[in-house]
Amino acid sequence: EVDPIRHTLHISEESFSWMEEILDAWSEDGKPIFAVSHYLFENTAPLSFDSEIIINSNTIGEQDQQLRELLADYENVFYFCGHLHASFGVIEPYQVVVEDGGSFWEINLSSLKASARGYLPVPSTWLLYVYEDEMVLRARDFASGKWLTQFDQVLELSVN
């Protein structure tokens, strides 16, 4: 039963098959692959495991492991999500590792409308710069026009 306040993600088997076909095609050149969804994976952010209130229903849900395994089969996958309305200083990019040894990056984006935790002024988020061997996330407060270098992140790419 789905919590009426907090929801989860559902992906049909047809969509999983489509995603696998797309990932197969896009992974051939070794360039980064960006996947975007509203929900984060379980136990990847402080609010999904470091809370008095269990809020795993704020996450992908029952298909968590299936989606993890699919994304981890490919190099240079970056999964962008949100939902928590948490900003810089609370959630950093998280490397999701599966038992078989594959991994990908989960990047939880700030809310552009209202931030409940962390750096509160909105709109603020990361600007993404992709280079041959790394991806740079530069934090910016768009209301003030200031760069927030203390929250910048650099993620290495697998180079074939």
Each model region followed by its residue ranges:
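Short beta-strand segments
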Residues: F34-H38, F80-G82, I107-N108, A139
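Short amphipathic alpha-helical segments and helix-helix/interface helices
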Residues: L23, D64-L71, Y94-V97, T125
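Active-site environment of divalent metal-dependent phosphoester hydrolases
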Residues: V2-I5, Y39-P46, N76-Y94, A114-A116, ...
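Short, isolated positions within intrinsically disordered regulatory regions of eukaryotic proteins
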Residues: E20-I22, G30, V130, F151
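Binuclear metal-dependent phosphoesterase catalytic core
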Residues: A86-N160
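Divalent metal-coordination and catalytic microenvironments
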Residues: M19, A35, H83, L128
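Active-site-proximal segments of metal-dependent phosphoesterases and phosphodiesterases across multiple
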Residues: D3-S17, W26-F78
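Solvent-exposed, well-ordered amphipathic alpha-helical segments
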Residues: E20-S27, G101-S103
